[in-house]
């Protein structure tokens, strides 16, 4: 349970009042493919510290036993990163998982996360991600082989099943057979993707019946939603968030337009160097703006101009206008 607020622990920001509490809970930043790369993680931590662990874009090991250049870049030595990161593995082959886990250990990581929750059609069609939930006997064999030889701690991220939340009790029986460091549950089924309501009754079942520590993930997009969840589930010690933190990078710490602008500009400059030009750098930044624009009131007109521009100077001008003329909303409009 969050302790009582001490005197002076409310931070006033532009049109926001954000509580700053003693962080007894653990807050994780979920991976978002194409957004939360090593540059984003490093820059976010510099401007908005307080995240317990950042989860990396998943590695997909193959029989070739070789990391791609992108994967190597995303997996630097753990002691070279000034915050905690967790590599995420996406595979249905135990031997490939164990090889990749050893690569992570060799680089100094103390945990890897098995992703059996990704609902992407291209992933599921290969029997990976949430596709592994379709055959519990095969999943059991996979986990048995992995935990018999894993060189470091293994956590798991899962959904409730493929099509029906009633699949989850049998799935949890499988997970309960293994010493999973932490079971992150996104209480939707695969066919929902990210639409529709989450099944909180199934998450309650998990809380009551899991033999392993449990982390919650799903539909925590604003500080109000986080506070409401923690009030209903005070015993949950870890929460993973994704789109909400992309949309409001300072959701946990509080922020103002000046800090957001500095964060944005630092990201942009890094991407201009890495991508070697403005086109791809602006494309990456526009992906961030897809969520972050919802933090500003009356952003429709400037947002339309932002999406259309292909000129870096014009892009910079529009962004400056957003930060200097549009007020921050009291809370992110999570209407995606």
Regions found by a protein language model. Name each.
Residues 14-21, 32-103:
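Glycine-rich, positively charged N-terminal anion/phosphate-binding segment
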Residues 32-34, 59-61, 90-92, 117-119, ...:
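Active-site beta-loop-alpha junctions enriched in small/polar residues
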Residues 127-133, 255:
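Short glycine-enriched, charge-decorated loop/helix-capping segments at active-site entrances
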Residues 101-112, 116-121, 126, 137-212:
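Alpha/beta enzyme core
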Residues 13-23, 27-28, 33, 38-39, ...:
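Alpha/beta catalytic cores of nucleotide-metabolism and tRNA/nucleoside-modifying enzymes
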């Amino acid at each position: 349970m969050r302790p009582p607020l001490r005197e002076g622990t409310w931070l006033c920001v532009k049109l926001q009042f954000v509580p700053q509490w003693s962080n007894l809970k653990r807050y994780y930043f979920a991976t978002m493919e194409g957004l939360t790369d090593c540059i984003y993680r490093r820059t976010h931590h510099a401007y908005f510290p307080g995240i317990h662990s950042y989860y990396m874009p998943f590695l997909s090991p193959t029989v070739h036993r070789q990391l791609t250049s992108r994967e190597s870049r995303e997996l630097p030595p753990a002691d070279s990163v000034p915050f905690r990161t967790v590599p995420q593995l996406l595979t249905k082959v135990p031997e490939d998982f164990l090889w990749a886990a050893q690569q992570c250990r060799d680089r100094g990581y103390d945990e890897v996360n098995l992703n059996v929750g990704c609902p992407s059609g291209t992933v599921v069609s290969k029997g990976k991600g949430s596709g592994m939930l379709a055959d519990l006997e095969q999943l059991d064999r996979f986990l048995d082989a992995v935990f018999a030889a894993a060189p470091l701690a293994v956590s798991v991220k899962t959904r409730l099943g493929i099509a029906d939340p009633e699949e989850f009790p049998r799935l949890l029986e499988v997970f309960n057979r293994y010493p999973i460091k932490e079971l992150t549950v996104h209480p939707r089924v695969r066919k929902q993707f990210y639409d529709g309501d989450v099944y909180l009754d199934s998450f309650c079942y998990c809380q009551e019946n899991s033999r392993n520590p449990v982390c919650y993930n799903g539909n925590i997009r604003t500080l109000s939603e986080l506070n409401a969840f923690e009030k209903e589930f005070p015993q949950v010690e870890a929460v993973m968030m994704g789109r909400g933190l992309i949309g409001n990078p300072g959701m946990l710490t509080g922020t103002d337009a000046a800090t957001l602008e500095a964060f944005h500009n630092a990201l942009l400059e890094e991407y201009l160097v890495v991508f070697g030009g403005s086109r791809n750098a602006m494309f990456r930044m526009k992906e961030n703006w897809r969520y972050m624009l919802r933090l500003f009131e009356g952003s429709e007109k400037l947002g339309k101009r932002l999406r259309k521009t292909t000129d870096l100077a014009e892009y910079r001008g529009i962004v400056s206008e957003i930060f200097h003329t549009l007020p921050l909303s009291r809370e992110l409009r999570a209407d995606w």
